[in-house]
Design a protein with these regions (language model features):
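Flavin-dependent oxidoreductase catalytic cores
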Residues: 2-131
């Protein structure tokens, strides 16, 4: 089962993202997630994966690519935060790493967990292979 959060690509007036940076494919400007909402979202990924495991799925893929919420956190272009979730590459990677850590805790070591991650996002000021 694949788990993803659309982030700023959500076509909804209440969409959220790491920062209030509008997507070129949606008419809605996202609301920046609060620190509490970031932690709640991490917990939601882990809970969703645990529910999939309980439902009998063989594995879970957490979508960390294609420009969705996780990629938005890793890219300096879409993550302009100044707290522990933004700024340096290490801080921007905290969100996906915490999702994987918490999800692995919830699933145990023997359940299949995959996580594709974009190394490039092909936008000016975004992810480059160098990071």
């Amino acid at each position: 089962m694949q788990i993803l959060h659309a982030g700023r690509y959500a076509y909804h007036p209440l969409c959220v993202a790491p920062s209030a940076v509008k997507s070129p494919i949606s008419p809605f400007k996202p609301r920046a997630l609060s620190g509490f909402a970031v932690r709640r979202t991490i917990a939601a990924y882990a809970r969703c994966a645990a529910l999939a495991q309980r439902a009998g799925y063989d594995g879970v893929e957490i979508m960390g690519s294609e420009g969705y919420l996780i990629t938005e956190f890793t890219s300096a272009r879409t993550n302009t935060r100044t707290d522990r979730w933004g700024g340096s590459f290490e801080n921007r990677m905290r969100f996906p790493l915490e999702i994987v850590r918490r999800t692995r805790e919830a699933l145990g070591r023997d359940f299949l967990l995959t996580f594709p991650l974009s190394a490039l996002d092909l936008i000016d000021g975004g992810l480059t292979g160098d990071e």
